[in-house]
Amino acid sequence: MKNNYNRINTFIVYLMVTFSLISIISITECTPNHDPCPPQYAEALCLNGGTCFSVTIMGSDNYNCICAPGFRGWRCQEKDLDHPVNQ
């Protein structure tokens, strides 16, 4: 019986983490009014012409990048082969 409680508790924690991540992704992708990053982050965080923005989630500042066309990844560090830049 105790093993079943452990499985249920583990599943509940998994659901809580999953829904938290979904909320963060939704906020960062759908919120049109992002605050700009502080200069020390803006210069170092985003690569390949990406634009740094910050979103406050549950009292914590989170820094992300909006990538220039042709790039993707958390820091715009990867070439997006599905959308190459015309040269």
Curated annotation (Swiss-Prot):
GO MF term set: epidermal growth factor receptor binding; receptor ligand activity
Domain EGF-like: residue ranges: 33-77
GO cellular component: extracellular region
Disulfide bridge positions per record: C37-C52, C46-C65, C67-C76
InterPro entries named in the record: EGF-like_dom, Gurken/Spitz
Signal peptide (residue range): 1-32
Tissue expression per record: Expressed by the venom gland.
Name of the protein in question: U18-myrmicitoxin-Mri1a
Gene source species: Manica rubida (European giant red ant)
Lineage, uppermost ranks: Eukaryota, Metazoa, Ecdysozoa, Arthropoda, Hexapoda
